[in-house]
Amino acid sequence: MRILLIGEYSNVHWTLAQGLRMLGHEVTVASGGDSWKGYPRDVDLAHVLTLKGHVSFAWRLLRALPKMRGYDIVQLINPVFLELSPWPHRFIFDYLRRYNKNIVLGAFGMDHYWVKVNRELRPMRYSDFNIGDVVRTDKVAQTDVDIWIGTEAERLCERLAKDKEVQIDDLNKLAYYTGWTILRKSGSLTKPLLSNG
């Protein structure tokens, strides 16, 4: 089976690729190496935020996209799967969906639902957004709120999670459905996060 893993979070995709290769699958990891962590990858999509870095990233991405066709499975690490602002992701996602058989959406790292549930409802005693009953208002917590709430990243996350052609594996379904169930019970959400399943 041909498998493409896009994005990285704590070396999850590279480790998964090693295991899948041992089972005889053809696996390609395309990522930026999880930013400063520099994890291994087959296709380097690191993005340095300088003029030269932007040009280099755009060139490497445009050269890589035609090679990202014909896979049996493409797994995205999360809705923002490249080191890039959310807006271009929708076009890259549409391209990947058009030229590959199956898309699987991971729920690794931050996303809109994680931020919303943990910030507003605090189902866990400790999270990125609360310590016990005390809501974190420090710069680190607020940065994630600013990225994921009321933004293009939120809209991208909702679009991918609701796309009928995107599969969400069982572990990630649990993450998305748990968030949906908590939001629904609280009255913060009136319709399911996922329409595909």
Listing of model-derived features with the role each one plays in the protein:
Residues 1-38, 42-43, 98-102, 164, ...:
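N-terminal subdomain of nucleotide-sugar transferases
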Residues 2-6, 66-89, 102-106:
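Short N-terminal targeting/anchoring amphipathic segment
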Residues 12-15, 36-40, 82-85, 111-116, ...:
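Short catalytic/ligand-binding loop motif for oxyanion handling, primarily in non-cytosolic enzymes
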Residues 41-42, 105-151, 192-194:
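Acceptor-binding helix/loop patch of EC 2.4 sugar-transfer enzymes
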Residues 65-69, 91-99, 127-166:
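Membrane-proximal helix-turn-helix segments that form the acceptor-binding/catalytic region
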Residues 83-121:
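Conserved nucleotide-sugar donor-interacting segment of glycosyltransferase catalytic cores
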Residues 184-197:
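Conserved donor-binding/catalytic core segment of Leloir-type glycosyltransferases
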